[in-house]
Amino acid sequence: MEKLDKRQQELLYKIIEFYIKSAIPVGSKQMSEDLNLSSATIRNEMADLEKLGYLIQPHISSGRIPTQNAYKFYIEFILKNEKKSDFDWTLLDKYEVKFETRDDFKNLAKKLADVLELSIIVAFSKHDVFYTGMSKLFSQPEFKKDFIYVSDFSNLFDQIDEKIENIFDEFLKTKEPLILIGEDNPFSKFCGSIFYQINGSLICVVGPIRMDYKKARECLNKISN
């Protein structure tokens, strides 16, 4: 992909942030107010970002949404610049975090699903898998708009034992949260996931590609420290 200049990077980052929070296609007006630039300037920049493969316009009359390439840029950007979420982590402090028993991991997974509003998978071994938070996951806007998401993610959980068996040994080596999206994701091309190893078990945060990666990554780092 062609390298973006500083203004393009800032604009694309803001567009993705807005879309992650709202799930609404982004127009030039919202960005011009946020960046103190004219709507015309923003429109031109967004058109260029679309030509470069970072944005698409789902409908003629709508704004634009990020592509997989945009999310890859976003993930690299937040890791490089150590961008933090605005989540109130005192909400997580009330939970007692332990990793001594299977029940500790299961309880943690349920709490993470509540905090992140996503699904959590815990693989104790290749053949011992627990997951929770499907109702949280399916409450995301993607699943209300497009049945293909419901079908794809339902198939994912139907086949979760086989999928975990295929990735467990490799992903257990991860020392930092590993973020994989779209075509790079072992679960689904419609999926965003963060994988993390804690005390010999593999924890996976699973959501649509439009998931809050900053929040999920910080959450995994926080509970593991």
For the regions a language model picked out, list residue spans one by one:
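Alpha-helical promoter-recognition and RNA polymerase-docking modules of transcription initiation factors
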Residues: 2, 21, 35, 220-221
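Alpha-helical scaffold segments in soluble metabolic enzymes
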Residues: 10, 14, 30, 111, ...
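N-terminal helix-turn-helix
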Residues: 13-17, 21, 25-77
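Intrinsically disordered, acidic Ser/Thr/Pro-rich low-complexity regulatory segments
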Residues: 79-225
